[in-house]
Amino acid sequence: MKNTILILFTAFIALLGFFGMIAEPLADPLADPLPDADPDADPETVIVKAIATLSKKLLR
């Protein structure tokens, strides 16, 4: 019982952190990104590009 409560509490805290990270850009949508930011340095962009490339290869 104690382990179950600990697991649920940990999952709840993780979800709060996840949704908090999502809410940051929504709080200030007009904020400028860093001027010298490299879009390829963003891990999500790299993953999306890799998925797009793989899907193009598979669909040919």
UniProtKB/Swiss-Prot annotation:
Coiled coil: none annotated. Keywords: Antibiotic, Antimicrobial, Fungicide, Immunity, Innate immunity, Repeat, Secreted, Signal. Expressed by the venom gland. The keyword Signal applies. Residues 28-45 form a propeptide. Residues 1-27 form the signal peptide. It is found in: Secreted. One of its GO terms (biological process) is defense response to bacterium. It comes from the Eukaryota. The keyword Secreted applies. AXPX repeats lie at residues 27-30, 31-34, 37-40, 41-44. One of its GO terms (cellular component) is extracellular region. Belongs to the MCD family. Mastoparan subfamily. The synthetic peptide shows weak antimicrobial activities against a few Gram-positive bacteria (only 2 on the 11 strains tested) and the fungus C.albicans. Does not show activity against all the Gram-negative bacteria tested. Exhibits little hemolytic activity against washed human erythrocytes. This is Mastoparan-VT5. It comes from Vespa tropica (Greater banded hornet).
